[in-house]
Swiss-Prot record:
This is Large ribosomal subunit protein bL32. It comes from Opitutus terrae (strain DSM 11246 / JCM 15787 / PB90-1). GO terms for molecular function: structural constituent of ribosome. Residues 1-48 are annotated as: Disordered. The gene is rpmF. Keywords: Ribonucleoprotein, Ribosomal protein. It holds the Pfam family Ribosomal_L32p.
Length: 59
């Protein structure tokens, strides 16, 4: 089994762990009803995308 030739520095270890940080998802606000939804996606509450009705959502 391979073994490390040199000790890994604290900076290199921290940089590797930084990729595992949790990033909270951002939300956009719908101008018609004020509901929050993920940007660049269809609003699941009313089926609107960029001002157009693309899904028929039954209320």
């Amino acid at each position: 089994m391979a073994n490390p030739k040199r000790k890994q520095s604290k900076r290199r270890s921290a940089n590797r762990r930084a990729a595992n940080a949790f990033i909270a998802p951002e939300f956009a606000k719908d101008p018609t009803d004020g509901s929050a939804f993920r940007p660049h996606r269809v609003n699941p509450k009313n089926g609107m995308y960029r001002g157009r009705q693309v899904l028929n959502v039954e209320v």
